[in-house]
Amino acid sequence: MIWLTLVFASLLSVAGQLCQKQATCFVAISKRRKHIVLWLGLALACLGLAMVLWLLVLQNVPVGIAYPMLSLNFVWVTLAAVKLWHEPVSPRHWCGVAFIIGGIVILGSTV
């Protein structure tokens, strides 16, 4: 159950980052203020809930194991950036993502 909490904390953290990115996207001047407030408000909500879940994780998992698992954020953000904003990702970046996943598997298997 705690590992599921860690995954949700990671996903909410990523959602907060993606909302911040969306807040920076261009919109008409007449809608800009509402757009920014909406997306930054969602970002704060996601990041706040992620922090609460993260505290629950830290109560049950050594920080030396739990913290590296947040590297999943790099993986989620890369995938979302490609899907949502069609951002280019170099082969070198994908290689880095693969190393991150490998590291998470290695660290996760030590528990």
Swiss-Prot record:
SUPFAM superfamilies: Multidrug resistance efflux transporter EmrE (SSF103481)
Cellular compartments per GO CC: plasma membrane
The species this protein was found in: Escherichia coli O157:H7
UniProt function note: Translocates 4-amino-4-deoxy-L-arabinose-phosphoundecaprenol (alpha-L-Ara4N-phosphoundecaprenol) from the cytoplasmic to the periplasmic side of the inner membrane.
Subunit composition and interactions: Heterodimer of ArnE and ArnF.
Pathway: Bacterial outer membrane biogenesis; lipopolysaccharide biosynthesis
UniProt keyword terms in alphabetical order: Cell inner membrane, Cell membrane, Lipid A biosynthesis, Lipid biosynthesis, Lipid metabolism, Lipopolysaccharide biosynthesis, Membrane, Transmembrane, Transmembrane helix, Transport
Similarity remark: Belongs to the ArnE family.
Compartments in which it is found: Cell inner membrane
InterPro entries in the cross-refs: EamA_dom (IPR000620), Flippase_ArnE (IPR022883), Small_drug/metabolite_transptr (IPR000390)
Membrane topology: Multi-pass membrane protein
Main localization category: membrane
GO biological process: lipid A biosynthetic process; lipopolysaccharide biosynthetic process
Residue intervals passing through the bilayer: 36-56, 61-81, 88-108
GO molecular function: carbohydrate derivative transmembrane transporter activity
Name listed for the protein in its UniProt record: Probable 4-amino-4-deoxy-L-arabinose-phosphoundecaprenol flippase subunit ArnE
Periplasmic membrane side: 57-60, 109-111
Membrane topology (Cytoplasmic): 1-35, 82-87
